[in-house]
Every structure is written in C-alpha cells, then in structure tokens.
A protein has these predicted regions:
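Charge-rich amphipathic alpha-helical interaction elements
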Residues: 1-142
C-alpha cells in the first residue's frame, strides 16, 4: 500500500456517520488496529531502508575518499583527489545514493502520516461523545 492509498483509506474510515454514532463508536478499536498494523509495517520498512541507505553511503564514502578496493575503481574509475570537505558534496549529489535517500524520506512521510492518523483515531471517541452531547443539548435533554 502506498501513501495515496493510505490517505484514501483514512478518508473513508475516519468519516463519522452522524446518524449511527453508537456504531461509529464501536468501530473505533478496529480502525485503530488496522492503522496500527500499517504503522508497524512501515516502521520496519523504514528501519530496513535506513540500513540500506547507510550501507550504501559508507560504500560511496569509501569510493570518493579512495579507500575502496581496487576492483571498484577498475569497474568505475574515479581519478579526482577530493578534499575531506568536498566529500559530503559528492555524496549529496550522487544519483545512486539519492535513490536510497528518496526511499527513506518517502517511508518516513508515510510513518508520519500514519502517526497523525492514529492520533485522529484516538480522538475519534471524543468527537463522537461531543456529537452525542450536542444532540442531547439541542433536543433539550440537558
């Protein structure tokens, strides 16, 4: 599932049917559990992606600083002698490394979205209670 699908799912699941507030209240734990499963899955993916990124970054650092094995340079020669201060610029501009960074950033965005969605789900009970209280007030029961 990607971010857009999760956003569509959240739009659908978090909509409160104000004619059946009692049933909506009972749905909250199932909705919370569903999004918690997604959050757990994406946190594990984030951890795996970060490890891949850091591993790739180390290999690229070795390549740009001249510390990689000679076989690496026969396949992909790099004849420049970089200053230590310039290595980070080359790492930031490396297209292969950028793909790993982009993946980490995307998954982090999904995790952040799921965190905020779970907070909304946790507040759903208060929203339903407020709607019930408002109905009581407008009908003169309170």
């Amino acid at each position: 599932m990607d971010l857009e699908q999760l956003q569509d799912l959240a739009d659908k699941k978090l909509k409160i049917n104000d004619t059946e507030l009692d049933l909506e209240s009972l749905k909250t734990p199932q909705i919370h559990n569903e999004f918690l499963k997604h959050l757990t899955k994406f946190k594990l993916l984030l951890s795996k992606s970060q490890i891949e990124y850091y591993t790739q970054r180390k290999q690229k650092w070795e390549y740009y600083t001249g510390k990689a094995s000679p076989e690496v340079y026969t396949l992909k020669p790099f004849s420049f002698k970089l200053l230590k201060t310039d290595v980070d610029k080359y790492l930031d501009a490396d297209p292969e490394l950028a793909k790993y960074k982009q993946k980490v950033d995307y998954i982090q965005t999904v995790v952040d979205f799921l965190d905020r969605t779970l907070k909304q789900i946790s507040n759903r009970g208060f929203q339903i209670k407020n709607a019930i209280d408002w109905r009581k007030f407008t009908s003169g029961a309170i």
